């Protein structure tokens, strides 16, 4: 044990050295150490050779002209981690031979901070070295390095030209700043300084930039001093040399100063402080924590008062006080006092929360006192909730702080004194930062700092110039003492006294915690009454207040009081079933509200109480409470168990010392009780061996006790654990390993001797499992089986959002009626209703045990919820419940748009009205949130910045590519208008887009149907990329090629919601299918009539039908006519645009064919009946032999017709379609016919009700109209434009069905996906028009598909389940595919989700189906055969069957369309059910061969051109992504001729250059290329085929480094001879162990420069690495030349002990971590692609 009265001593300086750069031709030559003197009394010296670069940060070079000398200091770190200060005097020496001036630096290293004094000493030494006749420097250096001085003394040194006085401290108690802090605040401002200090404490990387050496030194010293009482523990470099600029890309925290004249790029992730102009640059992604608002704002206020003292006097006409300028020295100390006061407030009372887990230490290993800090208890006591306090108390800063200040008998400093001020207790509680007491504290702190520094350093200023020649001879010995130096050691500055523990007064805080219980007195009284009623068996009284008491557990005083009351009632440890359930409910509610830090000790208290309370389940068998409280995350938090164990050992130690137990305080912790640990620690060494033995026994006993508690809370009492052997074994092994690891980490800190092995833990666990097995058997079969104790199987990402509620599930039809689903005869069922973020789940068992003993599950998607309805008809109550005596008061029907209704009933005696209303309220609140975007739009807070707010498709892709590691960009070479040009070299760029992005857009289908043909007068328009013309349309669509971009906006104004006519499909005969909304109101019709009248008087547009040919106008003539037809007046002009556009659509077919319809087909396809002008029957009822056709037929709603001129070659057809409102009502009636409430009120038959719903008529009418459209396009060869209503619903149904009937491709799985994406998603269908109901149009479309598949069972590749699956999930909200109503909103949603973690992101329905197809054929139609003809289904009502999806009820496993939960439910019920493989983890890019072989592909129109079609599709997508960017960049720019420059390899010289792409620095180790013409330099990793600057494109053909011919030197060293070392019987080491492989014919597998972390200074140093394919070692050299010239490697990394490989990206660079058995190697690459290349090569060598 150290002697408290012993005073330490040491030398003033550790090292004095002279460094000189001799003349050399090498630009990279390093200087020589001319002379060096090291103190023999210091063992932790810094080698002078390691600081040569730091002595001259601007670089070592000689010059022809002398320059003034410079002085600065560097803060360095020794190998043991202690800080040293290197004072450097840089000057110039004249060389007599060359007449140049050599660079000379005199370095003095010390641990004392006296810059002024040491500068004078260095000048004195320099002056003496230049005057050989005067040699006092030897004696001065001897005194500084050899003389021992007691700590606390003041040394005065006098010579003829020197007089300095300085204080001596081995370990400075507080920093010395002089005027540095005042200078820092004046340069940056106090807000920036506060930001910097908090950034340091948040582990940010900070770069200080300035052009001055001394400014960097002073500012870094000021910043480090403001951290007091903390010490900066990360990398700290005062001035970084120019050659080490790559350190700025280190991923670890640092504080580094750089010279702004050399470094131009400071890294995108670093905080940069520009000292010269006072600017601070903070990256957007930097996280800087700040304290609570009171402490943070108080610091601002105090700094403002100190810096601007006259603010309160400036507005007065006669100031009360005379303005006095504050000296910078005094201002410096006041500013430091504000920060000391700030940290004292944050850490006030920390002394009480230090846990001593071992006082005497392990006697055998001679360990010292072991201690930790109870973070959670301290934060709870101080009520700290901010992120900074949490981060700071767990950081390395605070751990170092505790280790140096926790011991009671030590020398106290200023912070110890300030942190124990009595005034702080009340000031923090009152939160009065501007009080007079606060100002007094700041004055006191500043006075203490001033008093210390005033006699720490005194010196006389030197004014004469130094000489220009050094005569010191290398190796010269120090001269003997010639008494030329007078030095005096004055008495100590302060008495070096070891004091007892200093503790603050926390009475005010303790009283506050005690008084807070008064604010909750009424709630505490309710809790006491409820617990009293529970323990007394008053069930009815307790149940009335149980819900309210459970809700009040969110308040901390209530949770604390619950623990106290349960602790007092321990005598009632044997509970009844009802008591057990109620207490478990309250304990779970308390644990749910507690955080993992356990601030008030509630979790620790309940941990012990759960092992006390139990209930009797059988004779001699008990179920303890810990089996009911295991589902909380805190039990899996290792930090909680560690702090809990330390606290228990801590209390055991001091209970032993006090010989009594400590009482529980107001927060269940005993920290603030006196005497505390720091007061009771005895440092006496008597009987130490016996005390250590007692401590070991105590810790071992506590470890066994905690092992039992861990086992009890980790082993589950569940069916999965006890019934399934595989799960039982895996859970058992996992829990055992976790318990062993937890105990090992705990006991390892306390210095254990013998721990608990894995075998012993397994023995304890097996014994515990055996005792639990009997309890489980009794619980699962006996009378203790809890009603409704069914845990639902949840989908991935699904979780409960409310507590389950007990209820009964009733049948949805009457018992007397014929049930469509025989499973409904199993109802009523008794169980629980669960509410998750996706579904409402009922799970239970049938009331009639004779019906079935299986589980009944029924689900409804939450997003599809339509309404609640309270049923009052008593006939709905089943007779089984009446016979059981169940009192049913409330019957609720929950209706859904995609599943059958759930009818639930509640027992009046068990569930009160409040619980029912609360549960339904939670359902209603969450029913508007889809599961697909639940994390994005509700719980997950996505950072809002500019890159997330996408308005166009192009900007969305730019947002996507920002997440990629490669900086390549997509550039299109296609023209702005006309046909799409292929860009084959851009195809692979699509791999960098978001996965499966090309599936979502309709544009990929246009090349397949021939819209890219030059014959077709169509083009793709990009005018809607910003969604301004029509927000509900896609960004690109097909329009006539004769239409201008500016004309489209005018055309759109004539249609509802601006949904103008666009082409969506083309038949093989050239007929087009056009979709649009209806024409606008009657006003627009009047405008069109005016145009018609005008055109009749001056007909300009003519069309002729001669023979079999149709004469069409050319593009030029159409433009002339359109321009000539414009007359004065806005109305006529606007309507003229509509007419011209209709005419252009009619003239845009591929070719004109015969207009005569054969007689034999006319009666079959003429089906427009009501108001249709197409059918012209003769007297016999058959069509005439020749029917005149039009090029375009426009389908309009009957009653909303528009007369189109005859000469426009188009005609309007009035049809009677189904309105969307009628479709909605029909679907609702169709769903209601199966509900019991409908059957009770309507005594009609089922078929009559089905026909009365009008749903079959709607489906029939849709098929009938689709057949007519197909007839027009295939037999009449005419184009059809569907313009009905808003163009979102009925138009979409008819357009989709027409394409489905005509094109066999759409009847395949891939084709149907494209059809839905194109017609329903891209063109803006409302799947959920409002928050209450969902659109019935998509259900009607799928019903039509089902009817067609019933008539043609072999025509579709997909199955009935596929159709029902899409129908279910179109309203369920599980997939993001059907959530938003237009392309623009989907882009925004996908962009937000792209930044979510992988566990929160969801997939679309098509990805799900593809993954499922890998393991199941449920979505495929086994009867599918290739049918290339048109399908014409019957539309008669007798042929329309009821779609079972509309009435089906699933009670066995839940909805089968929730595939994953349903399969797991089936696995739980059916033991013989074989679970399929984990298909959710499969890669959908791989194709299952069995499905490829089984599936029959539909015939394409030109199979020989399939590859071209795929390229066309990708080219269209590239055009889609780049159109907006191309429009913005080409607008207003001249189309200059493109010039191509070639990039060539480039070697960087001594001076770094800047990369013109990423703006980072190119060093001599960087792989670089440059353009000789443009004089640009680029990283090789930044080049992506080309770099365009203006009209100049720079190309680069990358050549792999491995293709370079091996140097002859490298081949020579490839076959080294085994050169034996000095022979020894035990020495077998040869040079082969450090040499590359011996095979000279094998080239290296991978080579290149990587930065390696240094061992001493922890800096990143570039090395040349070589990996051979036949050697398990990675060799590295100093540079490429060393490898080339066959030099010996500097070292190697042995891959024999390789464990794992970790790859991370830090900015532009890639960080490689090679984890070996006993060591981890960290390497930095130039870019992430280089790191990936090394990873693949290393893995290849390991595999081989």
From Swiss-Prot:
Source species: Caenorhabditis elegans
PROSITE patterns referenced in this protein's UniProt entry, alphabetically: DENN (PS50211), PH_DOMAIN (PS50003), PPASE_MYOTUBULARIN (PS51339), ZF_DAG_PE_2 (PS50081)
Function description: Probably acts as an adapter for other myotubularin-like phosphatases.
Domain of life assignment: Eukaryota
CDD domains: C1 (cd00029), PH-GRAM_MTMR5_MTMR13 (cd13208), PTP-MTMR5-like (cd14534)
Keywords from the named record: Metal-binding, Zinc, Zinc-finger
One Gene Ontology cellular component: membrane
GO molecular function: guanyl-nucleotide exchange factor activity; zinc ion binding
Domain called cDENN: residue spans: 165-304
Domain Myotubularin phosphatase: 996-1447
Protein name: Myotubularin-related protein 5
Disruption phenotype: RNAi-mediated knockdown causes no obvious phenotype.
